[in-house]
A protein has these predicted regions:
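The feature captures the beta-strand-to-loop junction immediately N-terminal to the Walker
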Residues: 40-42
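Conserved signature/switch motifs of ABC ATPase nucleotide-binding domains
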Residues: 133-136, 154
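Hydrophobic anchor residue at the start of the ABC signature
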Residues: 82, 148
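Short coil-to-helix segment of the ABC ATPase nucleotide-binding domain corresponding to the Q-loop/switch region
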Residues: 92-101, 202
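Conserved ABC transporter NBD signature motif
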Residues: 63-75
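Conserved ABC ATPase "signature" region
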Residues: 110-130, 182
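A short, flexible loop at the N-terminus of ABC-type nucleotide-binding domains that lies
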Residues: 1-3, 12-26
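Helix-to-loop junction immediately C-terminal to a conserved catalytic motif
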Residues: 55
């Protein structure tokens, strides 16, 4: 059984004029245990909408999503989400931000267990030295590390990432990508990530799923990324297979024509 099953999901919104807009149209996708899937596509095609539906933050207009065999009806501890914004509480230390999530996920656990889980999560992202620092005292990259630690601390079945490195400089982004790969390989967590960065998708993914242009977006194409793991960033830069993936994805994104606006109305 797949860890995550997206079954014939459609999502409609109503604008201020009362007109309906079909954002997603009958999207179906099965994501296997420990698989890393990246969602790509033009801005506004519904990638983040789909991720929010998987997170339980939005309810689909039609269709259903199952996680570990259970139909999703709202947020749950088996799914954790990391956004582009770190979303840390500024009056709490890095440790306290992580502990707050752990306390919610493991209700009734002893204080010693909560402390251990929180500290281990920060250790996982190499932030032992920043455990008592406040968000304003650490860099943007370190804030995102705390966000990732908070997500892994609750031991989710599925990790959802919405452009978590999009606002970071290239070197910090590369470092966090490497950290993410290391942690995912260690924890065997299933990951669904939204990104606009093609190279990031190729480096991280087992599969890259491209949505068609919206409105009424569907799955346009899927690439199976079969380069061997662990992946070497420098070797991938000149690897023939990776270059071919990059070429095909760029061609897809640049040549894809928009669906006429009227086709998205319902």
């Amino acid at each position: 059984m797949a860890d995550l099953e997206i079954n014939d999901v459609s999502m409609s919104f109503v604008d201020r004029s009362g007109k309906g807009l079909l954002a997603l149209d009958r999207v179906s996708l099965a994501i296997e245990n420990s698989e890393f899937v990246c969602l790509i596509g033009h801005s506004g095609c519904g990638k983040s909408t789909l991720l929010n539906i998987v997170a339980g933050l939005l309810a689909p207009t039609k269709g259903a999503i199952r996680c570990a065999g259970t139909t999703i009806s709202g947020p749950g501890p088996e799914r954790a989400m990391v956004f582009q914004s770190h979303a840390l509480l500024p009056w709490m230390t890095c440790y306290e931000n992580v502990r707050l999530a752990v306390k919610q996920a493991f209700k009734g656990a002893a204080a010693s267990e909560l402390k251990d889980r929180s500290e281990q999560a920060l250790k996982l992202v190499h932030l032992e030295h920043a455990i008592n620092k406040y968000p304003f005292e650490v860099s943007g990259g370190m804030k995102q590390r705390v966000g990732i630690a908070r997500a892994f601390a609750v031991e989710p079945k599925v990790l959802l990432l919405d452009e978590p490195f999009g606002a970071l400089d290239a070197l910090t982004k590369s470092s966090l990508q490497d950290e993410l790969v290391r942690i995912v390989e260690k924890t065997r967590t299933t990951v669904v990530m939204v990104t606009h960065d093609i190279d990031e998708a190729i480096f991280l993914s087992d599969r890259i799923v491209a949505l068609s242009n919206g409105p009424a977006a569907r799955i346009g194409r899927i690439w199976e990324i079969d380069t061997l793991r662990p992946r070497d960033r420098l070797k991938l830069a000149t690897h023939a297979g990776s270059l071919q993936y990059r070429k095909e994805i760029l061609e897809y994104l640049y040549k894809r024509e928009c669906v006429p606006q009227g086709m998205g109305e319902r």
